Amino acid sequence: MMEQLRKKEQHIAKVVGECSTQGAVSVSFSTVQLAKGTCLEKLRPWMLRYRCSSRTGYAEWLADRAGAQSVRMAELLELYWDLIAVVEARFAVVPSEVEEERFYRRFQAHVVRRVGRRITCTARGRACAEDKYPDFQQIGDMYGAVGDEQGVHLYKWVQSSRRLLVLMDERAAGRVDLKRWLVMMMELVDGARMLRGCQALQVYVSREDLVNVKDLLKNLNWIGGELVQNVGDRWSDDEAMVWSDERYVVIRFDC
């Protein structure tokens, strides 16, 4: 991984970790919050905690307005752009002959340009050129991270297909209680108002994570998942970047 992205991951883990000292927490934001002129109050993230509800007696995602105050406003823009960069970099193909620093600058400019296009289309209520790409290649309408005792799992919401794409923390190899983790993520989809209308949870697990890949594939029928065929390499319209989902085993769960 490029050093620039490693630092961004560390920043995300630090901020989310400070919010998740007691159980799991979800920190997310809408891409349109990055529009120029957005006031600081509207930059606040959506925060949910996975905890026992006095209403039901079971763990569920509950809004945490007090917790949102603990994320300093000065960090929010940096956190949001870091989340976008790290999620999109997971699917970007780095040419072996290109120097890392030069590639990163090109990648960063490319992503910023496409985020701007997504914001403009959303603000004007019109279809976006992004929508023709496969889900993993699209700039998301929302980005977020779930922090728990097993790591920081990243996600993005693709409105055009109504799918939530989740990247399991690659550092959590072999340590995830898959049943509990999947229930928690499905309940995030069910309980988060900004994800209403979600039709599928699409989980991306690194092929190098042999333990979790094996467990997921072995229990596909039991957990109600469907193995999704990889799309492979896809160029962007300007042919500046190549995206690919080949690094991952992709499993879809209907919501």
UniProtKB/Swiss-Prot annotation:
Pfam families: ODC_AZ
GO biological process, one term: viral translational frameshifting
GO molecular function: ornithine decarboxylase inhibitor activity
Description of how the protein assembles with itself and partners: Interacts with ODC and thereby sterically blocks ODC homodimerization.
Family named by the database record: Belongs to the ODC antizyme family.
Described function: Ornithine decarboxylase (ODC) antizyme protein that negatively regulates ODC activity and intracellular polyamine biosynthesis in response to increased intracellular polyamine levels. Binds to ODC monomers, inhibiting the assembly of the functional ODC homodimer, and targets the monomers for ubiquitin-independent proteolytic destruction by the 26S proteasome.
Full protein name: Ornithine decarboxylase antizyme
Species assigned in the record: Eremothecium gossypii (strain ATCC 10895 / CBS 109.51 / FGSC 9923 / NRRL Y-1056)
